[in-house]
Amino acid sequence: MNFYDFSAFKMNGETVSMSDFKGKVVIVVNTASKCGFTPQFEGLEKLYENYKDQGLEILGFPCNQFVNQDAGENSEINEFCQLNYGVTFPMFQKIKVNGKEAHPLYQFLKKEAKGALSGTIKWNFTKFLIDREGNVIERFAPKTEPKEMEEEIQKLL
């Protein structure tokens, strides 16, 4: 199994295969609308705007597993992200990132990420960096601001 073997539903219900992102550098992030880290949407959007033409994709996956910080419907979450942070990168339907019902993509990402930040997702805005070949290169903690990832992203572009 690799990153490209998975699929997920976009906010509009469309099934998207991760193979659509072959040859791109990808950030996968679990998001929440009512979290202290929610302002990271702004930094993620800035990265996306600055590097999408060079092959960066950011995939947002809302999750309500951390103190119900994304309890809204998918349509409400999507509208919140667009209106408050101008998010233009792809947002997917709400998923679970931990437990038996964790989305298969997140089961894979947690298994593939090595080092101190492997295993269970501890909070919203955990970010996974994937290279152009679909390898999980790094897992960034929720407190890591998107701009702090820029150097690693540039190395892969």
From Swiss-Prot:
Keyword field contains Glycoprotein: no
Highest taxon of the lineage: Bacteria
Substrates-to-products reaction catalysed: 2 glutathione + H2O2 = glutathione disulfide + 2 H2O
GO molecular function, one term: glutathione peroxidase activity
Enzyme class per UniProt: oxidoreductase
PANTHER family per the UniProt record, alphabetical: GLUTATHIONE PEROXIDASE (PTHR11592:SF78)
Protein name in UniProt: Glutathione peroxidase
Gene: gpo
